[in-house]
């Protein structure tokens, strides 16, 4: 009998395939959507900028006027000591948090809520931004980085600007060790070995005098887990 496939091993949930979330700095989300933000604004000061393992963008520690501290995603151009505003009457400038309904059309935004008060769900990767496209009664249309136009509640909050860390892809890894350390902070099994390059005991496509499948690549949806590789329940190949 052969060894278990990676897909079978992954289902067991060993540390190798788990996201090392214990290394992260903490929860990165907006402060609670209270009355202070709904009728006015809350001032906060950036007291530190941190690297968060497993995240493509830096995070800032912000201390608000009421003494509350939060980790937030910062835009390009924000540094330690600068002030940010959160609320319906906040100024339209990078780093400030406002409801979508109060943001003019064409302004780049990020960390967008899908439900008012959820803390931010969309457009959070380094260098990403969305655009406010249009406003209507009871809805705001936002164009996401994928090009999809999403209709959202105008009370959903977003941050003005472009997420910091956008130039990270321009610098090559150069060494395999750098790639290893980068992906070890995420739930990514790397390097990824091809099935035909394995031994017969490790994979259905392994073994042989040269690298070839040796069997049809299409398999049934109901086939056994140890054979379910290739084109699974394919309509065509």
UniProtKB/Swiss-Prot annotation:
This is Large ribosomal subunit protein uL2. One of the primary rRNA binding proteins. Required for association of the 30S and 50S subunits to form the 70S ribosome, for tRNA binding and peptide bond formation. It has been suggested to have peptidyltransferase activity; this is somewhat controversial. Makes several contacts with the 16S rRNA in the 70S ribosome. Belongs to the universal ribosomal protein uL2 family. The keyword ATP-binding does not apply. One of its GO terms (molecular function) is rRNA binding. Residues 1-26, 204-237 are annotated as: Disordered. Part of the 50S ribosomal subunit. Forms a bridge to the 30S subunit in the 70S ribosome. Residues 1-11 have a biased composition (Polar residues). Residues 13-26, 228-237 have a biased composition (Basic residues). GO terms for cellular component: cytosolic large ribosomal subunit. NCBIfam families: PRK09612.1 (NF007180). GO terms for biological process: cytoplasmic translation. Keywords: Ribonucleoprotein, Ribosomal protein, RNA-binding, rRNA-binding.
